[in-house]
Amino acid sequence: PIRVIIGNPPYSIGQKSANDNAQNQSYPILDQRIADTYVAGSTSTNTKGIYDSYIKAFRWATDRLSPKEGSVIAFISNGAWIDGNSHDGFRASLQKEFDKIYVYDLRGNARTSGELRKREGGGIFDSGSRTPIAITILVRYPEGKRSDSCQIHYHDIGDYLSREDKLRLIKQTKTYRRLDWETIMPNEKNDWINQRDGFFDTLLPLVPEKKY
């Protein structure tokens, strides 16, 4: 049985052509699993990002691991899922399928501007990625020892840090046990950070909702 999967999944939802290195490939069975879990648990009307390759990697890895033995997934990936509204179903599924979750938010979102861009700091992969990056560790206990609720632990690397600053902090930390973890209590919308207050739901929609 497979008990540990470690990797750096590709990100391909923004692929511009078939000549791009990270091609969008069709995996019907995997896509259906995503539809049955991450999409089914979402309230978002825009689910395109849920079929990104790095999200597919999470689904694939989760389904490959042995439920009897207990297992761990450790990925460094696009971190947009942490607070993306369209990723609420993904976050909800992680809570159901794992007993402990550790998210080390390395920030670095280059698709921002002004003061927010400065706060995001440098990208871990430099010019290789414009997305925010996160290290995620998912722990699932063996059958019979599963917890009734998932413990979610979050650590933000900090504001205004250069790429070199971030790499130095990661190297100095050495182990996840040394980080000062914040325990996250998701709200009813399955927000983990930057939680919404529900005011938006009181507004009248301009067009009917539909799934894309």
What are these regions (language model features)?
Residues 1-75, 80-84, 93-103:
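SAM-dependent methyltransferase catalytic-core segment centered on the flexible catalytic loop
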Residues 21-28, 92, 109-113, 122, ...:
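A sequence-level detector of short, solvent-exposed, charge-rich linear segments
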Residues 37-38, 103-109, 114-115, 121:
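Amphipathic helix/helix-loop-helix segment enriched in hydrophobic residues with interspersed Lys/Arg
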Residues 51, 58, 75, 90, ...:
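Phenylalanine-focused residue identity feature
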Residues 61, 87-89, 119-123:
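Short alpha-helical segments and helix-capping/turn motifs at coil-helix boundaries
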Residues 77-79, 105-107, 140, 156-158:
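Active-site proximal loops enriched in glycine and acidic residues that flank catalytic Cys/His/Asp
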Residues 82, 110-112, 145, 161:
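Flexible, glycine-rich phosphate/dinucleotide-binding loops
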